[in-house]
Amino acid sequence: MSEGSKERSAPNPSLPVLKKAAAWLDSIFMDHAFFRFAWHNWHEVVPGRLYRSNHPTPARLARLVKRYGIRTIINLRGERPYSGRQSGTNLLSEAAAAKLGVVHIYAPFESRGAPHRDRILRLAEIYRTMAEPALIHCKSGADRTGLAAGLFILINGGSSEAALRQLSWRFLHVRNSATGVLDAFFHLYAQSGEGRLPFLEWVANEYDEEALRRAFQPGGVTRTLTEWLLARE
């Protein structure tokens, strides 16, 4: 299993005091976790099966497990989202999940690149085998989380129209920017595969991520807003 895509079930859920303090400092000041103390971007994808949010704090994760019975967490950011540097937010999440008895899985995606075929197929396998209900999250819960939510819908027989609804302003997704390549992916399936091939068969045999990457042209002003002010990963 590749780096950044591991399933975690730590035998010792406790972080040493100094390491925990350092993780919190990194999470709050480097990962902007202070925004997520009050803002959660929490939504149901399929009630009782899949939920979505921004990256939850350990305390919020505990509340979600208690209220919704979350059994699996899928972290779409990857194990080391900052140029190979370990994330304090991830360390806290791993420890919290282990303490709560919840499976924690890394399944990284990009917010501004054409979705990779191998990552889509791996996520499909995770969805097939995971304990439900599950929570998917990235940093803000807008772009990669919207993609993963749409993939869940298509994998389970839903339409591209329903998948696209998971990428909207409602979740703070800006399609007229570089992150609009995720919308373009669903539109591509709608135009070239839907009604003719099951979604995963289309992904495995016909989807050309390089062609999508070359063809996609993001907006200008909105792209700048998204990439600089919102600091998309």
Question: Where in this protein do the model-derived segments appear?
Answer:
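Short cysteine clusters
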Residues: 138
